[in-house]
Amino acid sequence: MNSEKQKQLISYIAPSAPATRRPATGNEAFLRPEIGFTPKWYHDALGIDFGEQWHTDVVYRRKSLISMGQELMRRFGNRNIRWIQHPDEPPDLLTGTFGACTIAAIYGLPLIYAADNWPNCEHQYLQSEQIDRLTPLDLDINPFFCKFMDEVEWISHQNGRIEGYINWQGVLNNAYRLRGEELFIDMTLEPNRARHLFECVTMTMIEATERLYECQRQTEVHIQHSTVSNCLVNMVSPDQYQDLLLPFDQRIASTAGLIGIHNCAWNASAYIQHYATLPSVGYIDMGIESNLVNAKESFPDARRAIMYPPVELANKPLSEIRRDLELITHDYAPCDMVFADIESGTPDDRVIEVIELCEEMSEAL
């Protein structure tokens, strides 16, 4: 196994979960597809209710995961979808829990559950005075976190191993959920207020992650990476990112053996030079409009990935998707092709076609 590849992360999408990252094996294909479907896709196919019970009742969640795995097998056979490929591994009962709202919920924002979607949080934004008085939370007495850790303990006792990941999001994403659009005004007019909020959020993210990882280590699951979701980074200038946010991403990176950076399908070109200063980047993703050549040069040892928009997957002619993949193969690969958030109505044949395109291009190289 290539030792450098052991220092990489790859995209990972558990059934119905938002995309996250996991350690690479070192045997990844040159152009590796990662396929993921939304809760609505599974709700429409199987009638699974992804409301509050799915996120708080592990028994219910486990039963639904079995059904989802069976549906994937029925529709896609032995295609390159990881949940199909490894049915005998201890089940991952953690990934997808509370969607992308765990940190917001820890800070007291009520969650809004839906039968066919990930949770959202109510827009009960903190006011300026509340931000100024904010302190890092005491997780020992935090009601939401304590209840979540009860789930983790149940998984440990019943499953033996606590497999999976919580999507802790990123500093900017979490701060936006707490502050709303006023955050961007703070970053311009009251940068110290923004820094204070980022500080509190970062400390909570790190402490919550470390507590979960310690529980997982006790079940022989050793996770040594962190991942940050910078879905809103295009809302701030590169200079603002460098000044106000990069120090916190650096702190998160310094606590982990590897860090993964998620940018959604946006153009990440303007931020690449700053991301390149982070230590031990094991994964970075971006949209196809990014400067892929520069990204490859800037992150030669990381596993790179392209987030391919689900609307384009569903609607683009296959010939155009092929051209996109050829460009990516030439300028950016080896990399993951992340086909996430696939919705109901996307033909199964289209999913199979893009998997086969990735396999064809990998085999050619």
What residue ranges belong to the model's regions?
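Membrane helical hairpin/interfacial module
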Residues: T56-P110
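Conserved donor-binding loop and adjoining core beta-sheet/short helix segment
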Residues: L109-N117
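A gly/proline- and charged-residue-enriched helix-loop-helix capping module
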Residues: D116-D150
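Active-site loop segments of alpha/beta catalytic cores
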Residues: M1-V58, L137-L365
